[in-house]
Amino acid sequence: MIALPQDRMDQLLKRFSMIESQMANNPDSETYVKLASEYSELQEVVGKIRELTDSRKEAVDLAAMRDDASTDAEMRALALEELPGVEKRIEGLEQEVQILLLPKDAADEKNAILEIRAGTGGLEAALFAGDLFRMYERYAAEKGWRVELVSASEGDAGGYKEIIATVSGKGVFSKLKFESGVHRVQRVPETEAGGRIHTSAATVAVLPEAEDIDIEIRNEDIRIDTMRASGAGGQHVNTTDSAVRITHIPTGIMVVQAEKSQHQNRARAMQILRARLYDMERQKADTERSESRRSQVGSGDRSERIRTYNFPQGRVTDHRINLTLYKLDRVMEGDLDELVDALISDHQTALLTELGH
């Protein structure tokens, strides 16, 4: 039996009942939407707590029936037969409740900004960056998320030197946040006549999309410069100054957007700047919570080599959790659930270990 915090469970049950009552009595109030949101957040954990409470009571009743000599023999035999199944159900429910009670990452339900940059490996690295972007696009499509391109710098032989996109939908950041880091590819390039395997890499950064309420950017802390945007070969895209560079003076973070619309460039640049500042705050908070207590999966170290995609062997290996899958073709088509679920599970295990200390 897992020792669960009964006081915390009782508080949640009490709060849920209070919200139900307030929603029923004030269906047209301004606070209804806020109450409905909290109701939705608590619904799953409260449902599991109630299910667990009922199952525990059922187990107690069955054990009493089994041990009561005055009970009919057939009923005692039935109780004896049913009890192990109920106990197994309780075990599963306790694990589910334990995970649902873990501290929530405030950014989990946010949309994300996905940044992929070609690393070592030249032309092949840019091609791989393109492959990774398509992989995430397909994964997003399977999840019903929306992917919108923010900016892209194409590679000389295809793919991307850098590509930035927003990913919007339910639980986006919770699923993608463990993708940050260095992704390495081992394969024979199409241009390689000798059939030698080349190794190249791309860096992925997944940032939670920040809102004004998450991070405040003061006007005096930013410098905005406009420049002429030039396309491939150096020609001017148009005759107006459209490229925008925003510099956050206190941190030195610089964001450049060079699409055709200056107004859109400024909005996009502010969106990315806000996300990077919010991400910086989260990274700082993680560090302050003590390096030794952070789970390896959740460290978000962008310089850490997290995954290798080996094409000749048809395998993908996530080095943080020592997981190897021999279905590289499916992974590249966006079949990421097994990897993502394993990373989330490992992170939850680390959180449980932390709470136990």
UniProtKB/Swiss-Prot annotation:
PTM per UniProt? Methylated by PrmC. Methylation increases the termination efficiency of RF1.
Among InterPro entries, the record links this protein to: PCRF, Pep_chain_release_fac_I, Pep_chain_release_fac_I_sf, Prokaryotic/Mito_RF, RF-1
Keyword Cytoplasm in annotation: yes
Matches recorded under Pfam families? PCRF, RF-1
UniProt keywords, alphabetically: Cytoplasm, Methylation, Protein biosynthesis
Please name the Gene3D superfamilies in this protein's record. Answer: 3.30.160.20, 3.30.70.1660, 6.10.140.1950
Gene Ontology CC entries for this record: cytoplasm
Location of this chain's protein in the cell: Cytoplasm
| Record-level Gene Ontology MF annotations | translation release factor activity, codon specific
- Provide the positions where the record notes the PTM N5-methylglutamine: 235
Q: What is its main location?
A: cytoplasm
Q: Where is this region: Disordered?
A: 282-308
Where in the sequence does UniProt note compositional bias of the Basic and acidic residues kind?
282-294
The keyword Hydrolase belongs to this UniProt entry's keyword annotation: no
What does this protein's UniProt record list under function?
Peptide chain release factor 1 directs the termination of translation in response to the peptide chain termination codons UAG and UAA.
Q: What HAMAP family has UniProt attached to this entry?
A: Rel_fac_1
Q: Which family does it belong to?
A: Belongs to the prokaryotic/mitochondrial release factor family.
Entry protein name: Peptide chain release factor 1
Q: Which organism is it from?
A: Brucella anthropi (strain ATCC 49188 / DSM 6882 / CCUG 24695 / JCM 21032 / LMG 3331 / NBRC 15819 / NCTC 12168 / Alc 37) (Ochrobactrum anthropi)
